[in-house]
Design a protein with these regions (language model features):
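N-terminal nucleic-acid engagement/recognition segments and initiation subdomains in replication
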Residues: 1-77, 81, 94-101
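P-loop NTPase catalytic core of nucleic-acid-dependent motor ATPases
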Residues: 53-172
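Conserved AAA+/SF3 P-loop NTPase catalytic/coupling segment centered on the Walker-B
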Residues: 170-180
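Residue-level preference for alpha-helix termini and adjacent loops
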Residues: 2-5, 9-14, 85, 113, ...
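Generic detector of intrinsically disordered, low-complexity, polar/charged segments
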Residues: 11, 28, 34, 130, ...
Length: 180
């Protein structure tokens, strides 16, 4: 039993429960306990499951980033390579060096948030502007080795609990359309 800090779900090795809520997982365990003659209350099942999962927290994103750091040869500039995929509007008057600096800060912030235990909040949002079909969403998934680490078209109203839960269950999210 372990707790995935990215998707905020309890996981049990050997059981495919990826689509289940934490409450459903606890009820499943309660049923297994009762089938095997164990007398345990629903409340205790929830408490024990939460305690065990809390002691076994992990982040697949952090694991991936740590492995990527070990594999990095120190020579290739992957950030600059990614930046080369973007085009700034020449009529906007934007300073390309400053925009690249902000892009790097955003990437660093994404990595910091992966390792964050809740003490910090992200500073800044990467905003990609352009016509449909030019690759803005594709860029999101280019960053992510596993599609389930990201979400697209998310809308966030901080007053709506479900919006907050949905948006925080991923490493990187693409927010829905912005107005001009």
């Amino acid at each position: 039993v372990k707790y995935n800090r990215v998707n905020k779900k309890v996981e049990i090795n050997g059981l495919n429960i990826s689509k289940c809520s934490n409450e459903a997982v606890a009820l499943l365990l309660l049923g297994i306990a009762h089938e095997n003659g164990l007398k345990i209350s629903k409340d205790n099942t929830f408490s024990f499951l939460a305690a065990i999962a809390d002691m076994n927290q992990y982040s697949p994103v952090c694991d991936f980033l740590e492995e990527a750091q070990k594999a990095y040869n120190g020579k290739q500039d992957y950030i600059r390579d990614m930046w080369a995929n973007f085009e700034l509007d020449p009529e906007s008057g934007q300073d390309p060096d400053f925009c690249f600096f902000l892009f790097k800060l955003w990437l660093i912030s994404a990595v910091r948030m992966a390792f964050n235990k809740g003490a910090e909040s992200a500073q800044g949002v990467l905003v990609l502007v352009g016509a449909q079909g030019i690759g803005k969403t594709r860029f999101l998934y280019m960053l992510l080795p596993f599609k389930e680490w990201g979400a697209e078209g998310v809308s966030i109203d901080p007053q709506v609990k479900d919006d907050v839960i949905k948006s925080t269950g991923f490493w990187i999210v693409e927010l829905g359309e912005f107005g001009e």
